[in-house]
Amino acid sequence: SAIKGRVPFINFFDGFRTSHEIQKIAIWDYDDLKEMCDMDAVAAFRNHCLNPERPAMRGSHENGDTFFQHREACNGYYDALPEIVEEYMGKVNAKLGTDYKLFNYYGAPDAERVIIAMGSICDVAEEVIDYMNAHGEKVGLVKVRLYRPFRADRLLEAIPATCKKIAVLDRTKEPGALGEPLYLDVVTA
């Protein structure tokens, strides 16, 4: 997705779990990885990188009159990125039998209360949701898989139409802010 979309990615994990757990992992064969890789996009990426044979100036100082023009020029890349990520999630799903989406819903199909979260809290929330639904509650969880760029339409598609209340669990605390980043995105959506 990063190479085809021409936008850098940050993959983040919950540090405590990563440093305190032992888990088995499945490693893909190189042939499987090759199927996932768009070699035309890789070639375009390599042709665009810095090269002494094709000198170019990047990262130079800009004044305000040109900075915002360049800043706005990259919007098209970010706007196209969710569809590219969905395309690759589809390829991974087909290969591994998973069901990754930008926003995955878990819980009662007629949930009245829904949690929206990302990260390891989702595993704990699933256990609680199973318990509560088994005892007559109607609750669910939306797991955020791609946080930025945030696709409000995909979030709304993931929330059951029966939902009356939403709780956003955010791992960030920004003192003095009106709300945390994920919460503000959900409210805006």
Per-region residue spans from a language model:
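Residue-level recognition of short, well-ordered coil/turn positions
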Residues: 6-7, 137
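Conformationally flexible catalytic loops at phosphate/diphosphate-handling active centers
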Residues: 8-104
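Thiamine diphosphate
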Residues: 1-4, 86-189
